[in-house]
Amino acid sequence: FGFDFDTTMIRIGLMNMILHGIKKPHMTYLDSLSKQNEIKEEFTVILANPPFTGSIDKDDINDKFSLSTTKTELLFLELFFRQLQAGGRAAIVIPAGVLFGSSNAHKDIRKLLLEKGQVQAVISLPSGVFKPYSGVSTAIIVFTKGGNTENVWFYEMKSDGYSLDDKRDKIDGKGDIPDIINKFKTD
């Protein structure tokens, strides 16, 4: 399943799923944060790289959100948490500010994830990993819905296998990714 309100991204997403062997790809035209989102399904896995450092008009925000904010990066995290079934797992790309922000909404989303979920890992990504599209410092947060957090595995990725400038030239195409996978599996 996938949702987007950009038809070009929907076409790209569908083609990507087909190329990766998904027989019946499903993507829907939907602004996930808006009042039009009436998706009730709960998912076992959510992988997402939502748009961040944006905001949404307060009048357009779905009434189901408990966070008092218009910041999309926080609203998406709450949405993903809510749409996971108990025991479901998510890996979400977030701006690093989500981890350290001091607003009440930042504190509330961290409290939700830590106390009503199990945050397993925070993987800090190198600055420039999303260039030329974004220079925002980012991380991947991995969590499960349910329980509470006891230990969090942290990893500071130095390289994703590509140059961190605007050209993003291939270095080895792997960087720290094999090490992250190996260490995350064993921890």
Explain the meaning of each model-derived region.
Residues 1-4:
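Conserved SAM-binding motif I beta-strand of class I
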Residues 22-32:
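Conserved SAM-binding strand-loop segment of SAM-dependent methyltransferases
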Residues 10-12:
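Short alpha-helix immediately C-terminal to the canonical SAM-binding loop
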Residues 17:
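Conserved hydrophobic residues forming the short capping helix/wall of the S-adenosyl-L-methionine
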Residues 36-187:
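A conserved structural/catalytic subdomain of Rossmann-like adenosyl-cofactor enzymes
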